[in-house]
Amino acid sequence: MVFRKLGEGDVAAYLEMATDFYNSPAVLHSIPQNYIENTAKAVLSGTPFADIYVFEENGAAIGYGLLAYTYSQEAGGTVCWLEEIYVRPEARGAGVGAAFIEFVKEAVFAARYRLEVEPDNTRVKALYRRHGFSPLAYESYVLENGKKQ
């Protein structure tokens, strides 16, 4: 298995997988397709705020991971958000998500690694705990800006 950064030739597979992710129980709601497209464009243009990794096995894209970067005084430095981890249904249960988490911990330097999970997704919560994550007792709040980038 190879984890590599998104390239131009990966965009169609990424769009398909991200669309599937946002139409699954792993998220609270779907998002407009142009948000997914804009993320790919931003990453390919070299934004310093995000990376997309393609999970490749035997020449086929079997998943992706979206990372986002921020700075946190509370964490004492850079925070790497594991925003999305998606594995195609036929590749699930083979340790792909676990391998990606370990890859990120080794390849991406950060003072803190952070992620979110649906409250009832006990299987994924167990995976995260096995890899050293623990719950952070904050509630999250958002304010949507009508001016999209």
State where each predicted segment sits.
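Conserved beta-strand-loop-alpha-helix junction that forms the acyl-donor binding cleft
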Residues: 92, 114-125, 142-148
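Glycine-rich phosphate/pyrophosphate-binding loop shared by adenosine-nucleotide-utilizing enzymes
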Residues: 1, 59-64, 80
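A short helix-loop-beta-strand connector motif used in the catalytic cores of GNAT acetyltransferases and
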Residues: 41-54
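Conserved acetyl-CoA-binding loop-helix of GNAT-fold acetyltransferases
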Residues: 87, 93-106, 126, 130
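Conserved GNAT acetyl-CoA-binding A-motif
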Residues: 101, 108-118
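A short beta-loop-alpha structural element at the N-terminal edge
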Residues: 2-16
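Conserved GNAT-fold acetyl-CoA-binding loop/helix
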Residues: 15, 19-42
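Conserved beta-strand in the GNAT
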Residues: 54, 60-69, 86
